[in-house]
Amino acid sequence: MRAVQIAGGLEQILDLGVEYAQQRTQFGRPLGNFQVIQHQLVQLAGETSTARAAADLALRIVGGANEQFAIAAAKARASAAVAPAAAIAHQVHGAIGFTQEHRLQLSTRRLWAWRDEFGSEAYWNTQLGRMALDAGPNSFWPALAVSHVKQGE
């Protein structure tokens, strides 16, 4: 499932960004001590966690009543996270992140490829809209809330 791969790739670039911000010093202090870098890393963590949550939910309900809806939502959310997450990771790293020797560029190039495989976020958002319209007005909230997922699974 591409959404799971994307979520894992996002976690990797988040880890690389945090590690770099802790190690790199600028103006006599770690880059991670600057508030703007902290804010960027929090935004990256937010994109990562929402993609991971959507992918995890889709995995948990495979075979369930709303499987297709959850899979579409996971791919749409994970794909939508790629652009802002990659931009933030490269901003934190600066030019070093674009060099051939650095792992960041390998991860972000792979994320960009996965983003469009099996349909972009626009495609999956369209599918979600169609599923919601086809299900009717009384079915959308139960599908969205996935109340059928058992606690503790």
Positions of the model-derived regions?
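Alpha-helical interface subdomain recognition
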Residues: 1-153
